[in-house]
Amino acid sequence: MRLLAEVGYAETTNARVALETGLTRGALLYHFPTREALLDAAIAHIQSARTKLLQAAVDGAPKGADRTDHAIDAYWRLLHETPFLAFAELEAAARAEIQLKARLKAAQEAFDRAEIGDHLFDLVQGGEGPRFQASRDLARFMLEGLARARLTYDGKGRTDRLLAVVKRAARMLNRKGSLHDLWPES
């Protein structure tokens, strides 16, 4: 998982994994005879780690805090953690590799349908239905896109402004704010 996040998919070879983990190549090949077997195990491991981090964010929600703000801040932090970086690297690599795309599909669907929805639902305590799903999707996909962006100037300022807009938009969709709150003049 760490190698995927740090050096990327192309450089995460069986030989590199063996070297970094201190295993002989033979020992690694005994447990993972093919790159595909290693990938399947890595995807399952990464998925489990992402789920645990999301649950910890739910469990760590401060009492009395704005749940929408907490959910967005928590997910933003998680997107910079190794399991999320590794999964993003696999998703990027899957664009050009059909077999990897097929291997990732189940994990992506599980995360989209269950884990991310349930955990963010617990975080924001939103309602059900298309409006609230749109709120969660807006926040999730904006944050994921922003996490992958390479802002070339004023990165912190631009990021902070975008995070504030995402929070206000999510509140509006959750009927906790007005359209005029999206970009207040001040």
Where are the model-predicted features located?
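Solvent-exposed, amphipathic alpha-helical segments
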Residues: 2-6, 53-57, 86, 90, ...
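Hydrophobic/aromatic-rich alpha-helical bundle segments in the mid-to-C-terminal region
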Residues: 101-105, 121-186
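Helix-turn-helix
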Residues: 2-37, 41
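Secondary-structure edge/capping motif, primarily at the C-terminal ends of alpha-helices
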Residues: 61, 94, 150-154
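Short helix-capping/turn signature of helix-turn-helix
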Residues: 32, 77, 90-96
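Amphipathic alpha-helical packing segments from all-alpha helical-bundle domains
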Residues: 50-56, 78-88, 98-126, 134, ...
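Hydrophobic alpha-helical connector segments
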Residues: 37, 41, 54-84, 135-139
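Short, basic, alpha-helical segments at the C-terminal edge of helix-turn-helix-like DNA-binding modules
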Residues: 44-50
